[in-house]
A protein has these predicted regions:
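N-terminal signal peptide c-region/cleavage motif recognized by signal peptidases
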Residues: 13-15
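Positively charged n-region of N-terminal signal peptides that target proteins for export
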Residues: 1-4
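N-terminal edge beta-strand
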Residues: 20-46, 57, 148
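Short structured motifs
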Residues: 32-37, 96-101, 112-114
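Short Gly/aromatic-enriched secondary-structure transition segments
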Residues: 61-69
């Protein structure tokens, strides 16, 4: 009986029923992301982003990563990361402005990061970018989190 109660608790706990939404994004040797917008819907409690570097060049020549911050923090986070080098994935260790980030990868490689949408603030603009030196000005896109489900919007009107 004790085992059955423990199993029921695990199966019914929020972590066990969390809806992980998967997003894929491609980066190229031409210093661009192929997707300009990534969108996450209200039913997602966790997001897993997988970055695919579709290029051919190695990480130390044309490496890319995927970094998510508030739009207002992009330049400051990118500039702070330049000074810490490739060994730190061009991300200042402990930078709390970074919501989520992958490691720097070279051509033909993949890297993933998973994070909770609880970190995101409704009504806040988010941007993803590559933090490799000189990349963030052209390698960026919008990250849209729809905190309200389509049912909420239909019942309460759009706001």
């Amino acid at each position: 009986m004790k085992w059955l109660c423990s199993a029921a608790f695990v199966l019914l706990s929020p972590a066990a029923i969390a809806d992980v939404c998967l997003l894929n994004i491609n980066a190229t040797d031409q210093m661009r992301f192929e997707q300009q917008t990534l969108q996450v819907e209200a039913q997602c409690t966790e997001v897993k982003v997988t970055l695919h570097n579709t290029g051919k060049l190695p990480a130390n020549v044309m490496g890319h990563n995927w970094v998510l911050t508030k739009t207002a923090d992009v330049a400051a986070v990118a500039n702070a990361g330049m000074g810490v080098g490739l060994a730190n994935n061009y991300q200042k260790p402990g930078d709390t402005r970074i919501v989520a980030a992958t490691k720097i990868i070279g051509g033909g490689e993949d890297s993933s990061v998973q994070f909770s949408v609880a970190q995101l603030q409704t009504g806040t603009s988010y941007t993803y970018f590559c933090s490799a030196p000189g990349h963030y000005s052209t390698m960026k896109g919008r990250f849209v989190y729809n905190a309200r489900s389509s049912i909420d919007i239909a019942q309460n009107g759009s706001k």
